Amino acid sequence: MAYTKISDVIVPELFNPYVINTTTQLSAFFQSGIAATDDELNALAKKAGGGSTLNMPYWNDLDGDSQVLNDTDDLVPQKINAGQDKAVLILRGNAWSSHDLAATLSGSDPMQAIGSRVAAYWAREMQKIVFAELAGVFSNDDMKDNKLDISGTADGIYSAETFVDASYKLGDHESLLTAIGMHSATMASAVKQDLIEFVKDSQSGIRFPTYMNKRVIVDDSMPVETLEDGTKVFTSYLFGAGALGYAEGQPEVPTETARNALGSQDILINRKHFVLHPRGVKFTENAMAGTTPTDEELANGANWQRVYDPKKIRIVQFKHRLQA
């Protein structure tokens, strides 16, 4: 019986783009438009070296009162102020042995099957990284205008009314919010309150949940805090389109295979360099030990500083309890 090796079925030139494309198709962050890229961010990520930060200058809005025109006074030129956002290139990788992929190797299209499993893995990892970043971002007082914490109040449960309160933390920019990320327990509570509608995608035919016309992303890696009295405090996040800047970098060797002769194992190695950045909150590197941040360092508020006006940051943190 012929033995199929990983190196026999993996063609890196085909495998790499397949994994990248499939990862974005599997992730609700990408499908809902929360994570979006642009030419500038892509170019910066491609040029960046290991662990490099990416500087993204921007122009502040023009402000000040208009000047009255008359025959005697000249207009006084006002300053146009610039600011700078900063993202970090995240470097990650993993390896899997032929034992892990044995069933997949025996299929009719093993490369696509393996690629789908690797893409699903990275979709989960990138979602986990986003929530680590948000934990760090919202641990700072400079994000107070984008936070609503009702968990300590008598009526601090997730409901239609409290959700509206959270949405309007952005004031007249509320309409920019297009999705909400929540724990499955929060989702269950919302379903029981008859707050969830399921909409069928016109292209894929897949039904996905929505709440007040906002797409729902359910993830059990969302924070849950248990207080001393046993009360659980849940964290949900509201997002706008493009709230996260996304770009793929260029690892020197994104995919390779290896052979462990002593263990009779083939090994698939996959590496990713990428940016997933909450736009408008600068990564400062103040508490980063290595060349690229760990999940714990991403969750450290010392590494983040708000630079955009609060209403321009299309993310709101909502802390609440659930209906008994």
Curated annotation (Swiss-Prot):
User: Does Aminoacyl-tRNA synthetase show up as a keyword for this record?
Assistant: no
GO cellular component: a single term: viral capsid
Q: Name where it's found.
A: Virion
> Main site of residence?
virion
Instruction: Please name one Pfam family that this protein belongs to.
Output: Gp13-like
Instruction: Report the domain of life of the source organism.
Output: Viruses
Q: Which InterPro entries match?
A: Gp13-like
* Keywords attached to this entry: Capsid protein, T=7 icosahedral capsid protein, Virion
The region annotated as signal peptide is none
* Record keyword Transport present: no
Q: Which family does it belong to?
A: Belongs to the lambda phage major capsid protein family.
Q: What is its quaternary makeup?
A: Interacts with the scaffolding protein gp11. Interacts with the decoration protein gp12.
Main role?
A: Capsid protein self-assembles, with the help of the scaffolding protein gp11, to form an icosahedral capsid with a T=7 symmetry, about 61 nm in diameter. The capsid encapsulates the genomic DNA.
Record's protein name? Major capsid protein
Species assigned in the record? Bacillus phage SPP1
Q: Which gene carries the instructions for this protein?
A: 13
